[in-house]
């Protein structure tokens, strides 16, 4: 569904649509340098709510060949929005895409990199090693549910995970 819309970044506090695979950069992990490509994840929206940072780009590390494939299909965006094409693509994903097995997830890890630059041009970056993305998502969701269930009074409204659980929640 997202292929038809291209990419999304936040610039000067506003969400801005950009082409699919709009920008790439090298991500300097401790174990290797990887190619990152911009992706329209929800973090483009939520990170601004949590931090107030006005300019946000989210990257995913992929092989350079994947970046090239994504850029080749940019012109197909309008076609990808048609219901029959959507149905075909969804059926292909359902048949061909499988997540990792429990055995593979057990020992897998995810590396998260972040970088921030202030108005004076000073930069800071950090790298965090977590369990694989599937496991991390489940553990985080269960922790949030436990907090909500234990609350003495209802916690209403909209929260990002870090606004509800604290900025260091991912470290617990």
Where are these regions (language model features)?
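C-terminal catalytic/substrate-binding lobe primarily of soluble NAD(P)-dependent oxidoreductases
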Residues: 1-172
């Amino acid at each position: 569904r997202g292929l038809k819309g291209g990419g999304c970044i936040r610039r000067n506090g506003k969400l801005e649509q950009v082409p699919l695979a709009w920008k790439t950069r090298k991500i300097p992990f401790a174990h290797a340098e990887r190619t990152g490509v911009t992706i329209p994840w929800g973090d483009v929206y939520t990170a601004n709510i949590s931090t107030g940072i006005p300019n946000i780009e989210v990257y995913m590390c992929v092989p350079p060949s994947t970046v090239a494939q994504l850029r080749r299909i940019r012109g197909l965006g309008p076609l990808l929005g048609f219901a029959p094409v959507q149905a075909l693509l969804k059926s292909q994903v359902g048949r061909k895409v499988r997540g990792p097995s429990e055995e593979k997830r057990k020992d897998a890890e995810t590396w998260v990199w972040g970088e921030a630059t202030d108005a004076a041009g000073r930069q800071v970056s950090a790298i965090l090693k977590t369990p694989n993305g599937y496991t991390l998502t489940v553990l985080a969701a269960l922790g949030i549910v436990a907090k909500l269930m234990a609350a003495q009074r209802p916690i209403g409204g909209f929260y990002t995970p870090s606004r509800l659980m604290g900025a260091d929640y991912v470290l617990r």
